[in-house]
Amino acid sequence: MSVSAFNRRWAAVILEALTRHGVRHVCIAPGSRSTPLTLAAAENPAFIHHTHFDERGLGHLALGLAKVSQQPVAVIVTSGTAVANLYPALIEAGLTGEKLILLTADRPPELIDCGANQAIRQAGMFASHPSQTLSLPRPTQDIPARWLVSTIDNALAMLHAGALHINCPFAEPLYGDMNDTGLVWQQRLGDWWQDEKPWLREARRLESDKQRDWFFWRQKRGVVVAGRMSAEEGKKVAQWAQTLGWPLIGDVLSQTGQPLPCADLWLGNAKAVTELQQAQIVVQLGSSLTGKRLLQWQATCEPEEYWVIDNIEGRLDPAHHRGRRLVAKIADWLELHPAEKRKPWCVEIPRLAELAWQRVVAQRDTFGEAQLAHRIRDYLPEQGQLFVGNSLVVRLIDALSQLPAGYPVYSNRGASGIDGLLSTAAGVQRASAKSTLAIVGDLSALYDLNALALLRQVSAPFVLIVVNNNGGQIFSLLPTPQSKRERFYLMPQNVHFDHAAAMFNLRYHRPENWEELESALAGAWRTPAATVIELVVNDTDGAQTLQQLLAQVSHL
């Protein structure tokens, strides 16, 4: 009997089972213990293969692929700390709903807790963060293939959102020629190999329950809060809110077109808050809200009813309002709860939104971070997509820009970390083959610098704008101790990214004014390659501009 041959047949069943659940992208890191899984994936023509030498980046690459494809994405890594490096992406997927299938190779049980090399306690190591966890036994012909395939099917059928961790122990030898070992075991699955359906088909329907009193509530004074959603959903939500005559507070990830722009500015005005207090119901569609003033208002508003609608399970309301938590796809929920044409009830808020927008426009000529956030709409590629980083940049875009309705926008706003942002953006581009604009800060770029290797393989123009304000300038917005701010919070690195781009053979520009930026972008959008554009800006100007605008708008 050949152990290596049977390992591969066992792995082939696992990988083939994944194809029956929509898995097309497989992300693979190098490793020896994962050889059975890697070879099974490599030999399966149903898969598109992606490779990366860094498991943390690999997990985020898969996250980006899943965001756009809306299908589960598989990740294959070897044993040991390689597995632990998947933790950040797994956590993010659990909070934002992307389906990741983490296939982690492992040592067999007799090599755990005995000093064996690269052997750690992997089973259950991710605690409660995966939505589903499956610890497979060591491959053996004593276990029928139908058990293995039905176990995979069951786990995937139960996976509504988030990650499935499948721990896969393999004994040595891991290498060797294929022979007939396990062939009969594998063939007992019969014509399943030629079929395209799961061995075990389980139905888990997610249906939106119609709220019987909706016809009552839609006649009241309401507010619509739009969080993270798809581009198609964003356009529908904008039309729905307009028909109802309810003000729409749109997050940067809502893709609603933010009909009342600069919400994070005018929500700091007492007149706006007073008018919103008249709302009898708040309907929040989507989660992961960005704006600080929006979150502050959400925490203090007290409507008669607060409804949260999202495809992801859980409360999703840090303010713990009295109301309803409805698990449903946003588009399906809107269809069941049609709007009734009514006149807008808010008067002050549209006026304040227009005045806030005018204040922002008045400062657009200065070459700086806040102005880039405002201008970002002008730089979006046609028929393309936008990936927004975390920390200060996403807050500036949320507060100062107005993105087109239905234009695809992606970000990692679940745990809102700055790790893996370049890798996620690379996955977003690969899944769509669209021209992509990504914008991150300098520390975010440094954190995921080796992901520039992924940008050597793009299928359409990709522009990475690195806003270099020399450190974590978001802390300039917080009451951090002045004497300790630079060393312990901002941590300026005093670096530039030209050598990093050159190391990975990427195009690079460092414009010093808007004309040079626009010229660099024009050239980049004509080339199916990646371009790094570094904007070196005054370190505190972005944060100070935001604070100045907040003060101005609060007194309108």
From Swiss-Prot:
Source organism, top-level taxon: Bacteria
Alphabetical keyword list: Magnesium, Manganese, Menaquinone biosynthesis, Metal-binding, Thiamine pyrophosphate, Transferase
GO terms for MF: 2-succinyl-5-enolpyruvyl-6-hydroxy-3-cyclohexene-1-carboxylic-acid synthase activity; magnesium ion binding; manganese ion binding; thiamine pyrophosphate binding
Single Gene Ontology BP annotation: menaquinone biosynthetic process
Catalytic reaction equation(s): isochorismate + 2-oxoglutarate + H(+) = 5-enolpyruvoyl-6-hydroxy-2-succinyl-cyclohex-3-ene-1-carboxylate + CO2
Enzyme class: transferase
Co-factor requirement: Mg(2+); Mn(2+); thiamine diphosphate
Entry keyword annotation includes Transmembrane: no
Pathway: Quinol/quinone metabolism; 1,4-dihydroxy-2-naphthoate biosynthesis; 1,4-dihydroxy-2-naphthoate from chorismate: step 2/7; Quinol/quinone metabolism; menaquinone biosynthesis
Cofactor binding note of this UniProt entry: Binds 1 thiamine pyrophosphate per subunit.
Catalytic activity, EC: 2.2.1.9
Subunit details: Homodimer.
Function statement: Catalyzes the thiamine diphosphate-dependent decarboxylation of 2-oxoglutarate and the subsequent addition of the resulting succinic semialdehyde-thiamine pyrophosphate anion to isochorismate to yield 2-succinyl-5-enolpyruvyl-6-hydroxy-3-cyclohexene-1-carboxylate (SEPHCHC).
NCBIfam families: menD
Family: Belongs to the TPP enzyme family. MenD subfamily.
UniProt name for this protein: 2-succinyl-5-enolpyruvyl-6-hydroxy-3-cyclohexene-1-carboxylate synthase
